[in-house]
A protein has these predicted regions:
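Sec-dependent N-terminal signal peptides of Gram-positive bacterial secreted proteins and lipoproteins
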Residues: 2-26
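Intrinsically disordered, low-complexity segments enriched in polar/charged residues with Gly/Pro
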Residues: 4, 71-74, 114-115, 132-133, ...
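Domain-terminus/edge residues, biased toward the C-terminal soluble/receptor-binding domains
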Residues: 198-199, 210-215, 219-292
Length: 292
C-alpha cells in the first residue's frame, strides 16, 4: 500500500457537487501556517484528455447546467488539515473552509498562476530562449529538466514542462519571456491575483521556491484555480499525464515529462474519479501543497 502524503494545505475547485465528500488521503493532511499571519495541439499529448464536469447530458443529448446543491445541511467533514477550501467553480461560492484565510507558502502550485498569465499573454508557438539567469537562479535541489543557456522550447512545450514536471527554470524563462524579469512578472501575478479577488496573496517569483514574501491562502488559491481551469489552454495542460518535449543539449533525444498529480492516474491507488486537473507543490518550508 502506498503511503499517503502529508499536505500543507488544500485548495479544491468543483464544477458540480452532489455530495460533499473528502478523499481518503485528506484525513491525514497536516499543515504548518506561516510565522506571520488559441487552442493547444494534442499531437504530443498521451493517454488522457480533459474531463468535462460542468454539466450532464439529458436523453436528447443536450447539455444541461450543473445542478446547484444546497450544502448547508451537510455535516462538515473532519480533516486533519489545518487549511483547506472547497470552492464551487460555477459561482465561486465556498462549500467548505478550514482556515481558508490563513496565509501559507504555496510552493509549486504557484505555477498555476504562472501558466494562466502565460496562456493569456503568449502565442503557444512562440520560441522561449533560456537565459543564464533563468537556468541558474534556483535554490539547491530545485526540480529542473536540465535546460542550459541558449536552449529553446516553444511556449506550449514550456507549459507542459511547467505543470507536469514542475520545472523551475522553465518558470523563470516564461517570466522573462512575458515580462522581462522575475520581478516584473511577479508584479503581473499580483495584479492578476487582485483582479480575481485575492486579498491575502503576494507572489515574489514564478515558481514558488522559498521566499518569505511569497504566500497565499487556501481561499485565494481556489480563486486562482477557478480562473486557471476556466482557461482552455491551462485546463488541457493541467489534465495531461504525459508529454514529450523536443531535443535540448542535455536531452538530445527529447524528454518525456509525467504529471506528478497522482489523483489523475487511474493506475494509482490515489486516483480520484472526476478530477479534471491540478498541481502539486513542495518546498522545505511549505511542505506539500495541492490545488485541484
Amino acid at each position: 500500500m502506498k503511503k499517503n502524503k502529508t499536505y500543507t494545505f488544500l485548495a479544491v475547485c468543483t464544477a458540480a457537487i452532489l455530495t460533499l465528500s473528502v478523499p481518503a488521503w485528506a484525513s491525514q493532511v497536516t499543515i504548518t501556517p506561516l510565522d506571520k499571519g488559441t487552442s493547444i495541439s494534442q499531437s504530443q499529448v498521451q493517454e488522457t484528455q480533459p474531463i468535462e464536469t460542468s454539466g450532464t447530458q439529458n436523453t436528447s443529448g443536450e447539455n444541461t447546467p450543473a445542478q446547484k446543491v444546497d450544502v448547508s445541511s451537510i455535516t462538515k467533514p473532519t480533516i486533519a488539515s489545518q487549511g483547506a477550501v472547497l470552492l464551487n467553480a460555477a459561482d465561486g461560492s465556498v462549500l467548505f473552509s478550514q482556515n481558508g484565510e490563513t496565509q501559507y507558502y504555496p510552493a509549486s502550485i504557484t505555477k498555476l498562476m504562472t501558466a494562466l498569465l502565460v496562456a493569456e499573454n503568449c502565442n503557444l508557438d512562440d520560441t522561449v530562449t533560456f537565459s543564464s539567469t533563468a537556468t541558474t537562479n534556483l535554490e539547491s535541489g530545485a526540480v529542473s529538466i536540465g535546460m542550459t543557456e541558449g536552449d529553446t522550447l516553444s511556449v506550449r512545450q514550456c507549459l507542459y514542462a511547467l505543470l507536469l514536471k514542475s520545472a523551475n527554470e522553465v518558470g523563470n524563462a516564461l517570466a522573462e519571456h512575458v515580462a522581462g524579469s522575475n520581478a516584473a512578472f511577479a508584479e503581473k501575478m499580483n495584479a492578476k491575483a487582485a483582479s480575481l479577488g485575492c486579498t491575502n496573496t503576494h507572489f515574489a517569483n514564478p515558481h514558488g521556491l522559498n521566499d518569505p514574501n511569497h504566500y497565499t491562502t487556501p481561499h485565494d488559491m481556489a480563486l486562482i484555480a477557478r480562473a486557471a481551469f476556466a482557461n482552455d489552454i491551462v485546463k488541457t495542460v493541467a489534465s495531461t499525464r504525459t508529454y514529450t518535449l523536443s531535443a535540448t543539449k542535455k536531452n538530445p533525444s527529447g524528454l518525456t515529462v509525467t504529471m506528478g498529480h497522482k489523483m489523475l492516474n487511474p493506475k494509482d491507488s490515489r486516483y480520484y474519479q472526476g478530477i479534471i486537473g491540478g498541481k502539486t507543490g513542495y518546498t522545505s518550508k511549505a511542505g506539500n501543497t495541492l490545488v485541484t
